[in-house]
Curated annotation (Swiss-Prot):
MF terms (GO), sorted A to Z: adenylosuccinate synthase activity; GTP binding; magnesium ion binding
Keyword Cytoplasm attributed: yes
Gene expressing this chain: purA
Keywords on record: Cytoplasm, GTP-binding, Ligase, Magnesium, Metal-binding, Nucleotide-binding, Purine biosynthesis
Role: Plays an important role in the de novo pathway of purine nucleotide biosynthesis. Catalyzes the first committed step in the biosynthesis of AMP from IMP.
Alphabetized Pfam families for the sequence: Adenylsucc_synt
EC numbers for this chain: 6.3.4.4
Name of this chain's protein: Adenylosuccinate synthetase
SMART domains documented for this protein: Adenylsucc_synt
Database matches in PANTHER family: ADENYLOSUCCINATE SYNTHETASE
Main location: cytoplasm
Organism: Bacillus cereus (strain ATCC 14579 / DSM 31 / CCUG 7414 / JCM 2152 / NBRC 15305 / NCIMB 9373 / NCTC 2599 / NRRL B-3711)
Length: 429
């Protein structure tokens, strides 16, 4: 039995999609365990660039089973659009499985998300307005509608009618806007369910059977540890658990069946949306990193905030996710910067802090303690091993490993699949 979890160690957008796609080649099952279509990842397969938001990266390998686990919230309309997007490009989706326990995003979730965000004024948290948060709210409140309900005409109608009483009261009383009628949603979304039905099953059984038969299973996380609802920079977080522990809850696979956890990070830091960001750069170097690294959100198109590598953040990710391996991406983006900085600690009121404070007022006032390293000018985009890196680039990578306490198992020197290099096979480690 060999199972690997891929986790983002920063605020998302670390290049997980590329790494997952790379590792998918040697997996027999690829599963997502949390989030929804708020997470975008770009994959280059067969020389063609694809943008996915919901379907696992392994979909391009038709012999591999791809799972949307019970921990996700699924917008049926968005899922069907993504299926059509793949079908139009000649990609088969017969290998997709969707959990019958996954919760469904409905039009009132989208409307609630947009209205709530607008009402917060200067206190916006930067939601993608995809209905993710409200769907998870309903799940926790035990009024959510699951895939199994969507396929049952009577159950779906009954639950929809019940929910609309509450949702319409919210829209009318709180936001002074009209709600929805059952007729506006029911037939359309029931039909969506019928189109998805061929993919729906108990995915916990699929995954556990695969593991019990010694198949390699890859669990694909979305967002990143710093966006985790428990361990991230709350409330500037997502509504689920991207940490490795989310695998057990979000797929129905026991923790003892997880063998390796690969943390993915960039050689610098980026973030979309609001919230504290200790190493953020507002100068010309920040602009250079953003443009060279093409730091714009896959889902939103928003420019990402960028900053120096923060080892405090990645150490935090190591601890709460049990990281065993590190994939260091986008090293090439730093080429040409004369002096590089790595944050080794924070300073607050004259005191040095080695961990991420839970109090965001404190985190917002933390000043990064930097260690400086010399940069490099050489083109590294064709490098295939750590030994081939220029001395300064190699020392930078080694220092990242030392400061985070995680061994480098993979590194990338460009956006393409063939620019990702293996240092250690995570399936056999």
């Amino acid at each position: 039995m060999s199972s690997v979890v891929v986790v983002g160690t920063q605020w998302g957008d670390e290049g997980k999609g590329k790494i997952t796609d790379f590792l998918s080649e040697h997996a027999e099952v690829v599963a997502r365990y949390q989030g929804g279509n708020n997470a975008g990842h770009t994959i280059v397969f067969g020389g063609v660039k694809y943008k996915l938001h919901l379907i696992p990266s392994g979909i391009f390998y038709k012999e591999k089973i791809c799972v949307i686990g019970n921990g996700l919230v699924v917008d049926p309309k968005a899922l069907l659009e993504e299926l059509k997007y793949l079908h139009d490009r000649g990609v088969s989706t017969d290998n997709l499985r969707v959990s019958n326990r996954a919760h469904v995003i409905l039009p009132y979730h989208l409307k609630q998300d947009e209205l709530e965000e607008a009402s917060k004024g200067d206190n916006k948290i930067g939601t993608t307005k995809k209905g993710i948060g409200p769907a998870y709210m309903d799940k926790a409140a035990r009024i959510g509608i699951r895939m199994a309900d969507l396929l049952d005409r009577e159950a779906f109608k009954e639950k929809l009618e019940r929910n609309l009483v509450e949702k319409n009261r919210l829209f009318e009383k709180m936001y002074d806007t009209e709600g929805f009628t059952v007729e506006e949603i029911f037939e359309e979304y029931f039909e969506y369910g019928q189109q998805i039905a061929q993919y729906v099953c108990d995915t916990s059984v699929v995954l556990n059977d695969a593991l019990d038969n010694n198949h390699r299973v890859l669990f694909e996380g979305a967002q990143g540890v710093m966006l985790d609802i428990d361990h991230g920079t709350y409330p500037f977080v997502t509504s689920s658990n991207p940490i490795a522990g989310g695998v057990t809850v979000g797929t129905g696979v026991g923790p003892a069946k997880v063998t390796r956890v690969v943390g993915v990070c960039k050689a610098y830091t980026s973030r979309v949306g609001d919230g504290p960001f200790p190493t953020e750069l507002h100068d010309e170097i920040g602009h250079q990193i953003r443009e060279v690294g093409r730091e714009y959100g896959t889902t939103t198109g928003r420019p990402r905030r960028v900053g120096w590598f923060d080892s405090v953040v990645v150490r935090h990710a190591r601890r709460v996710s049990g990281l065993t391996d590190l994939s260091l991406n986008s090293i090439d983006v730093l080429t040409g910067i004369p002096t590089l900085k790595i944050c080794v600690a924070y300073k607050y009121n004259g005191e040095v802090i080695d961990e991420v404070p839970a109090n965001l007022n404190i985190l917002a006032k933390c000043e990064p303690v930097y260690e400086e390293l010399p940069g490099w000018e050489e083109d590294i985009t064709g490098v295939k091993s750590l030994d081939e890196l220029p001395e300064n680039a190699r020392k930078y990578v080694e220092r990242v490993s030392e400061l985070t306490g995680i061994q480098i198992s993979m590194f990338s020197v460009g956006p393409d699949r063939n620019q990702t290099n293996i240092v250690r096979n995570v399936y056999e480690a």
